[in-house]
Design a protein with these regions (language model features):
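Bacterial N-terminal signal peptides
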Residues: 10-21
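Boundary at the C-terminal end of the N-terminal hydrophobic targeting segment
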Residues: 24-28
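N-terminal secretory signal peptides that target proteins for export/translocation
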Residues: 1-7
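Short beta-strand segments enriched in small/hydrophobic residues
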Residues: 29-39
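CN hydrolase (nitrilase-like) catalytic-core segments centered on the catalytic cysteine
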Residues: 88-108, 177-271
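Active-site catalytic loop in hydrolytic enzyme cores
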Residues: 98, 114-192, 196-197, 202-219, ...
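Cys-nucleophile CN-hydrolase/nitrilase-fold catalytic domain and related Cys-dependent amidase chemistry
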Residues: 44, 49, 53-129, 135, ...
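Hydrophobic residues at beta-strand termini and immediately following loops
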Residues: 35, 84, 136, 161, ...
Length: 283
């Protein structure tokens, strides 16, 4: 028995050691603040104040990442943005970068971008040091809602960035309607997707319209196999054929299996902080 023990146990220990050293997905958590803010069309300074108030709350709750809605600076489908939007990098994105550095938070936010004579519905990801990590230009721009419409981005802007929290991607609202774009995201194997939304409908359609957003976020989380944070706003559309439609909040967070982790308030502002499970596999 002793001879068997001395011969077999070392081999067993070596085998166990090899097994435990095999490559495996690393499990971690990231603390995300979902910043469902009020956005008023054209109110750049007021919107920046509301962004900073949300960041203060996120910082107090020790968040790692703060997420914001689509067109958080000037409002979505606002034709005045053709004159007042800034380039990226530029004054607006620089202010976001300064806030990220001030509060020590990574920020994902939607903001309009002027590039020459074109206006883009864009979103940026900025790290806690204020470095611009990525810019995405919306592809599914709904051109019937503004004249002239937003310019369409390139599909190559759908990408992921390696960060301290894993591979993070950003797309915008109606981009998630497209199976083609969703499949491209899936091929990139993200660890976390952050999606600014401008989810608007007529007053009589709320709160039922929240369920549509929930179903959309859940369906994409299942395809992407990672947590998805869909951040909506509160407010009202004031231009174009959808004038008077309400942004009703109801931001949605789902895990990589499509389980709903949070739905934010109906037609009210809220900053909610959640610990999201991130499974960082070998890519």
């Amino acid at each position: 028995m002793n001879q068997f023990h001395t011969r077999v146990c070392p081999r067993l220990l070596i085998s166990l050691s090899l097994l435990t050293s095999l490559p495996a997905a690393a499990c971690a958590k990231v603390r995300v603040a979902v910043c469902q803010i009020l956005v008023i069309d054209g109110d750049r300074e007021g919107n920046f104040r509301r962004i900073e108030y949300a960041l203060q709350t996120a910082g107090e709750k020790h968040a790692d990442i703060a997420t914001f809605p689509e067109s958080s600076i000037l409002g979505w489908e606002n034709p005045d943005a053709h004159k007042s939007a800034a380039p990226i990098p530029g004054p607006d994105s620089d202010r976001i970068a300064a806030l990220a550095k001030q509060y020590g938070l990574m920020i994902a936010i939607g903001l309009d971008e002027k590039d020459g004579d074109k206006l883009y519905d864009s979103a940026i990801l900025v790290d806690k040091h204020g470095k611009l990590l990525w810019k995405h230009r919306k592809l599914n721009v709904l051109p019937e809602l503004m004249d002239p419409p937003y310019a369409k981005g390139d599909v190559e802007s759908i990408n992921v960035v390696d960060t301290e929290f894993g591979r993070i991607g950003v797309v915008i609202c109606a981009d998630t309607f497209s199976d083609e774009y969703a499949n491209r995201v899936a091929s990139l194997k993200p660890d976390l997707m952050l999606v600014p939304y401008g989810w608007a409908e007529t007053v009589d359609k709320w709160p039922a319209h929240e369920r549509d957003l929930e179903q959309l976020v859940v369906s994409r989380a299942k395809i992407w196999k990672c947590p998805v944070v869909g951040t909506d706003l509160v407010g009202e559309m004031t231009h174009g054929p959808w004038t008077g439609r309400t942004y009703g909040g109801g931001s949605v967070v789902a895990d990589g299996s499509g389980n709903v982790l949070a739905i934010l308030r109906d037609r009210d502002t809220e900053v909610r902080v959640l610990d999201l499970p991130i499974r960082r596999a070998k890519h």
